[in-house]
Amino acid sequence: MKKFYLALVLLALLAQSIDAQNKKRLLKFSTNSGNSRIFEYDKDGKLSKMQTIIQDVMDKENHVSTFTYTADKIVQSFYEGNPANTDTRIAILENGIVKSEALTCSYAKGGLPPYTYQYTYTYNNHKQLTEILEVPSIFYTTIYKLTWANSDLTLITCYRENEPMGEIHLDYDKTIDNPYLALVFNPLTMILSKGSVEPMGQLFGGYFGTVFKHPVKSIHYKVLKKDEFLWSAEDDIEFTYTKNADGDITEVTATEQETDKITLEWSKVTNGIATTRQATNAANACYTISGMRQKAPVKGLNIIKEPDGTVKKVIIR
């Protein structure tokens, strides 16, 4: 089950893959074991609904997340089967970046109040996420420190009580370097997802700052304190990507102790680049490489779409 959720994490982020020329968006992916995930988007190109269907041995599970957006927050509602039992995740935005989140889980045991998770995020001057503070109402406080190299997140170190518990080492497929392929896999989902509550709307929209330049090729786990780290070397995993003649990724192979293949279904979009923000300039639409629409070009690589449909890259130094 852990492996399946890791595969879900991988493929869910493919929905943010932007191809400004083909104008395609991921609508669905399915695994060879019969599991699937379906994506729906609002008129602005933001992820509005995500449905995950898990074909378990005994029963079929149906997980649903919905996302609503305002200028200062994102509200995610999640339920499994019964909408009466809904978990709520609220992201607080500052200048278009998530600064904190509060997750309230509906499940309560033994008459106790529903448990919660509080997240606080720290970024560097390049808008790269460098630290995550996770404070649950039960269990231990955890700090994740993130190390970047050449525009990619390469190391995540997990700390409890100032002692390192383990490391997540990330290697990337640098043969895939397409500015429109904004975010194929986001390792943040491994540490930000609690249960089945995955902050995909926040991630799809680039609300966690800088996105990654390349898709992940492999993940390796190093245990520093036994029985205190969620993963081990047995969870190491490698990914390979298959493209069609148009350059779209149509299949992903995830190899752990077993091999799982995931098929992707894409569809044309009618409103140009999938956007996550409204722009005030109707003449020229400006986007970051993550597909985030903005008022004006910013430092770094920008994607400019002109009224005639022409798309060009502009670098601001």
Features from the language model and the residues they span:
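Residue-level detector of functionally pivotal "anchor" positions at catalytic/ligand-binding pockets or at interdomain
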Residues: 22, 266-292
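Sec/Tat signal peptide C-region and signal peptidase I cleavage site
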Residues: 14-20
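Positively charged n-region of N-terminal signal peptides that target proteins for export
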Residues: 1-4, 317
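Sec-dependent N-terminal signal peptides
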Residues: 4-13
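A short beta-strand micro-motif
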Residues: 27-31, 286, 304
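Buried hydrophobic residues that stabilize the cores of well-folded domains
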Residues: 21-271
